[in-house]
Amino acid sequence: MEKGKGVSRKGRKLASSRRRQAREPADGQDAPVAAEAESWPSDADAELQGFFQDCGAKERGFVTREDLAEARFSFLGGEEPQMIFDWVDVESRGHLSLEEFSSGLKNVFGSSPGTHRLRTKRSLPSQRESVTSTLPVPEEADAEEKEAFLALIGQMETGHSLSEQAEIWKLWRELRQEEPQLAGNLEGFLAKMSSRLQEAQADREALAWTLRKRDSDHLYKVRQLYEETEEQIRREKQQLQAQSDSRGMALSAHMQEALEAKEQEVQRLAEGQRELEAQLLHLSSTQQEANRENLQLREAERDLAGQLEEVRGQLQVTRGHLDTARTRGKVSWQIEEEPSVPRANKEAPDPQAVPTEEAPLPELFGNNDNWDQFLSSIEAHSHRTLRLCWSPPPSPSSTSAPQTPRIVRQISISKISALQFSQEPASDPDPGPRGSPEVPPGGAKDGKGVEDPKGQDEQDVSSKQPVDSPDSDARPKGSFLWSLPGALTAESGTVEAAFRDQLAFEAEPPPQGLSSSPQSPAGSRKQTQTPDLGDKSLWSGPDPAKQSLEREVMAEDLKLGLGSQGATALPEGATEPSLSLESVDQVGPERPVQDATHLARQESHAKGFQEAPGQVLSLDSLPTHLPQSLEEQLRPEEGNLGERGQQDPGSEASESHGLEARSMESPQQDDPLPNTSQPPAETEVPAPGQMSPPRGSPILGAGAGLAVGTPETTHTLLTLAESEAQPGPVSMPVQVESKSGAPQPTEPEAESRPEDPRTDLQEAERSSSPGDLTAGKPQADPDYLYHVVFLGDSNVGKTSFLHLLHHDAFATGLTATVGVDFRVKNLLVDNKTFALQLWDTAGQERYHSLTRQLLRKAEGVVLMYDVTSQESFTHVRYWLDCLQDAGVEGVAMVLLGNKMDCEEERQVPTEAGRRLAQELGVSFGECSAALGHNILEPMMNLARSLKMQEDRLKASLAEVTHPQSTKRAGCCH
């Protein structure tokens, strides 16, 4: 047995050695194959990068297990990429970076001992044989044992390591040799355990796969929830931001509206403050002016009060002298008639017994003075300004009544400077009833109504009142016209003052020439109104004896401030002349005097002038008809004393009315200065043999009084005064047409003209040469003449606009223009006269050919549209095309929108018209022919544009010089 065992062991040993020998070359051959299998494929990198690009891992920067589930690699199986991912993802993050996955895959192929097992599947028998050949089978094992063992291993189908296979081999061989019945049990156990291991391995892999799947699904869901949460948060943020923005915008708009309201309120308050400040300034200036006027009035009141006291004192003295003279004269007559009472049947005493020229006022003239000498001195100095007008008293009606001494029955002491406002000449000696309708027959008294203590009416300081006479009751008291409204009384109206003035004038040297003082002396504030020179009775021909008298009186009157402004100075320094009676009411519209003010001024003339005879007046308002007053005042009185005494009251009243009418005409008709008429004025001069109109002729021209205050006017006035005394026919202006006498149709003024007579006089002097009688007429040729065409659709208001422009009135019911209409409008713009030929075209289409013909010579165009019609505004471009077709270039245009008063029906906004005007480069405006709004301004602007265009055209003209031929020096060069 032992020997057989030894043989078997030896044979077994030999068999193992033979297997080892047979395996060595196989091992040598397998070694390079294994090394070759474990190497990294060359195309694996390119395939791996393509996978990263396809699955989007390259863009994300990492790879997930879901990406590997769809991966297909040539060097890996279907599930091997996921297994490699699980092996590399130690932290179970669910994603790996590209570098981590690539390095892990390379490590699996390079150094891992199970790489060959992962790469290859030994399903083929050849591979199994190669594997079994590598088992550590002892050499002494025979072929049968090897085949049985390999069959056992093949049945197990489990991969075991070489050490495990060696242990199984030993265990199986020992059981086979020692206990063969147990070898089958071992084989069944190994097969069963192998199957269980396989099942466990499969379960493990399935569980791992499920776990990984769940993990990936969980991660996907978490990521999805995260993204949804982020999206919801983003939407919530956007919604909150939108709500916040809307609230902010609403709050901002509300605050902006509140701020604008506050700003408007501040602007209104500022405007109100400015208006209040302006009103305060105006009120303060008015108050200051009123204070100044009050001061002036107080000073004038004090002066008047002082003068009144002085006049009262003089009046008292005069009363005393008159009472004394009356008493003495009465006593002398009584003494003279006492012896003649018992001889009533005898003849009348000789007129020479009682001399008519005895001295009736011994206290005034002295006991040794001669009355004849006094009267002769009065005749010698009658050319002075002092006059004594007297008439013999009537004879007594009965011897029983006391007779008035034959003294001066009526004494009128006056100065020539007070004659301007009189209604009859001062040389009229008859104090008969000449009361005008405006003045009661009692004569005018002073402002305070001084009365005689005995109840008798007192004389006015300057009125012609007769001394009390026996026939004072039979004859009505004469009403002298010095006290009419607007007249002034003389300063000295008593006998004593008359003689004092007479002595003062005799002491003065005679004047050397006719010169006017620019300022009037104090105490000479008198006003004069001239009678009409048209009366034939006032003109007695040139009297050589009156020439020196008139010259001296003229100079004396100018020295005394004759023709000055009036007793009451106007508060604003107006220089308009003061006219008496109704002549003030007939002043033209250039002197707007209210009725109440006029009546108050008349009353002040009737009262206040007697209280203030000494106020100073300026010479600025000297009337231009002064020589006529002087001529009538200083006419000879020979032959009038007897006639005046025999006139009846009817003739005197008619003469008084004639004087009133003449005083109304004198400011308009008797202006001897042809170059001082207001423009426009027409003056007609009669022929040398033609007489002026009579005293009662109607007024031919109602012109306003001129304020003549310049030295040239005064010099002309004095020259005319001298020329009246020269022999020869007299040529006086008989008709003066002024603005007030012949009003022209009112049109919108291109320039505001002041209504000051001075300004009108200066304009007349500038526009006409001296002596030009037609200077006031409008110029025949304008400065500029332009051709203007109105374009626009029908019914836009072109005809209404032109009608309002010409007639200053809106005409209703105008029909559509047929063809074309033509008007001429004269405008005064920038001191230049523009004559605009305005062509009103028809808007109907059938007249457009005629309109195109007119456009060829157009220099200005007015494009008019209706703001209530969008179609008319659109057709403006059609009219522009018509202008272009007509070949008109450089035309001044105005775009004008009419009917702006129809705001509710407006279809064309103002901004649209302004934009179109800016696009065309023309001026723009909107007007309303119904309301008369903005009618004249566009035409004035068009006139200025036409003038500027003409100026530019003149400036752009180039002078064409004729080429000059150069002369050659000789015939050959």
UniProtKB/Swiss-Prot annotation:
Residues 219-310 form a coiled coil. GO terms for molecular function: GTP binding; GTPase activity. Keywords: Cell membrane, Coiled coil, GTP-binding, Lipoprotein, Membrane, Nucleotide-binding, Prenylation. Residues 1-21 have a biased composition (Basic residues). The keyword Acyltransferase does not apply. GTP binds at residues 792-799, 840-844, 898-901. GO terms for cellular component: plasma membrane. Residues 513-524 have a biased composition (Low complexity). Residues 428-440 have a biased composition (Pro residues). Residues 445-457, 548-559, 598-608, 654-663, 750-766 have a biased composition (Basic and acidic residues). It is found in: Cell membrane. A lipid is attached at residues 971-972 (S-geranylgeranyl cysteine). This is Ras-related protein Rab-44.
